[in-house]
A protein has these predicted regions:
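Bilobed "Venus flytrap"/periplasmic-binding protein-like clamshell domains
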Residues: 1-56, 173-187
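Short helix-loop capping/hinge motifs at secondary-structure junctions, enriched
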Residues: 1-3, 138-142
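Flexible glycine/proline-enriched surface loops and loop-helix/loop-strand junctions
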Residues: 6-11, 126-132, 166-172
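Short acidic/polar alpha-helix capping motifs at helix-coil junctions
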Residues: 12-17, 134, 149-151
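A generic structural-conservation signal
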Residues: 16, 38, 63, 197-198
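Pocket-lining segment of extracytoplasmic ligand-binding domains
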Residues: 36-139
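An extracytoplasmic/periplasmic, membrane-proximal ligand-sensing/linker region
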Residues: 66-69, 73-79, 83, 96, ...
């Protein structure tokens, strides 16, 4: 298995009660022009069992973070470990993937189990995690000042853990899948990074939420 398309007819772990993991795998399959109907679904009980199914020869692929500790075990096993890439110039593949998993974003993956001097990176995907979320009833003042505190104090916590660069102002994605709170929008407008295009996108997301709520 070297590409997502190579998963056709293969055994793929399907985690009971985990729409997040299975949804991400559906996005990977879609990139290769496939769906769950094109693979052999191997039902497993959890995240660890998903990777162990590959190690034990019960499955050929599983979904997980590229830095997940369980993959160290996979990498050391006779079966080995490989992350099929998602070439960023494959426009058709990305269109299919995003149609199924709209939270996917292109990313050059440099932190993964099994990396080496001859295998330092690959073109794949990522998505913001963790993120700040709140309820619509949260006050605009609180949302504004929390956003301001995170953005303005980034230099003080940027080295506190992996993935902190996601809290940098220049890395914010204003056209993603969740609507922004008015307080956050107020701050980003003050910084000059929020445009009318983002207003339109945000309004559409709020409208979509209203429809789903009904």
């Amino acid at each position: 298995i070297k590409t997502m398309a190579d998963l056709k007819g293969k055994r793929v772990s399907w985690v009971k009660g985990s729409p997040a993991l299975n949804g991400n795998m559906a996005g990977f399959l879609a990139f290769g022009g496939l769906s769950w109907d094109d693979v052999i679904k191997v039902e497993v009980s959890g995240y660890g069992a998903s990777a162990n199914a590959v190690i034990n020869g019960q499955a050929d692929a599983s979904m997980g973070s590229s830095v997940s500790s369980i993959f160290n075990k996979t990498n050391a096993s006779p079966r080995g470990l490989f992350f099929p890439p998602m070439p960023h110039n494959d426009e058709a593949g990305w269109k299919r993937a995003i149609a199924v998993a709209p939270h996917f974003a292109k990313a050059v993956v440099t932190n993964f189990v099994g990396s080496s001097d001859s295998n330092k990176s690959f073109e794949g995907m990522n998505y913001p995690y963790p993120i700040f979320v709140t309820m619509e009833k949260t006050s605009e003042d609180l949302s504004y000042h929390l956003t301001e505190a995170v953005m303005e104090n980034y230099d003080q916590f940027k080295d506190s853990g992996p993935g902190m660069d996601g809290y940098q102002l220049s890395n914010q994605n204003f056209s993603w899948i969740f609507p922004y709170h008015p307080g956050a929008v107020k701050y980003y407008k003050k910084k000059g990074v929020w445009t009318s295009k983002h207003d339109k996108h945000n309004a559409n997301l709020i409208k979509r939420q209203d429809v789903l709520a009904k």
